Amino acid sequence: MIPVRCFTCGKVISTAWEEFKQRRDAGEDPGAILDDLGLTQYCCRRMLLTHKEIIDELNPYQ
């Protein structure tokens, strides 16, 4: 689950997650994808670049 907003500046970033993930999985350069999505601030970029989906790993413990 990607956070809805950037922890530092508060910009909404969750709307860019699905497109970023699809394009990254297709082999595009992550930096170029973030530029195309309009995420130019370092804080917002790191939110998407460093995110790891762990929800599937946590589901058995619910």
Swiss-Prot record:
BP GO annotations: DNA-templated transcription
Keyword Hydrolase: no
Annotated cofactor note: Binds 1 zinc ion.
Intracellular or extracellular location(s): Cytoplasm
Names of required cofactors: Zn(2+)
One Gene Ontology CC term in the entry: DNA-directed RNA polymerase complex
Subunit structure: Part of the RNA polymerase complex.
Family note: Belongs to the archaeal Rpo10/eukaryotic RPB10 RNA polymerase subunit family.
Listed name of the protein: DNA-directed RNA polymerase subunit Rpo10
Organism the protein comes from: Methanosphaerula palustris (strain ATCC BAA-1556 / DSM 19958 / E1-9c)
